[in-house]
């Protein structure tokens, strides 16, 4: 059973998810992506995803990740990665939980590669905005799942630019800050709740976000 849910608000700094940067050595970066070390980083990140959100099975399939570099990837003379930030978005299917797994990679000053899993699906929100928005999505789901005390984000789905309520037109593809909305599927105690999430820009380089809990 899925329920659809109107607005509470949060504020977060938005880091553009479409600001791509080239790597200093594309061939070396491709070699890194094909390495066993990289595979280990991915598998470790995926192991942290809650089992009710994603788990592997013998029929798991993936078309391979789409990589979006948001800060240039560089390498030192010894071949170690010295800087870089990027997303890897991995479409998966075959285990009754078809989705896109999102993994964030950031290279620290000591060349350590840190990984963080974002919420699965096609959300356009960055990690900071996801972190703030999820509290309101859980709050929305809890209004229906009152007996449940734990929720997870099962999936996110980007729905489009522009908002209906309040009426906010899309500012266009040439604009860095565009309002958009998504549907977040929340799972709690075996029940699924579809929660609309709205994201709209303010003049101070912040985004407001709202989660809905009113039935359509």
Residue ranges and their predicted role:
Residues 22-216:
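Cysteine-centric segments in proteins
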Residues 1-9:
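Bacterial N-terminal signal peptides that target proteins for export
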Residues 4, 19-22:
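Intrinsic low-complexity, intrinsically disordered segments enriched in polar/basic residues
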Residues 8-17:
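Bacterial N-terminal signal peptides
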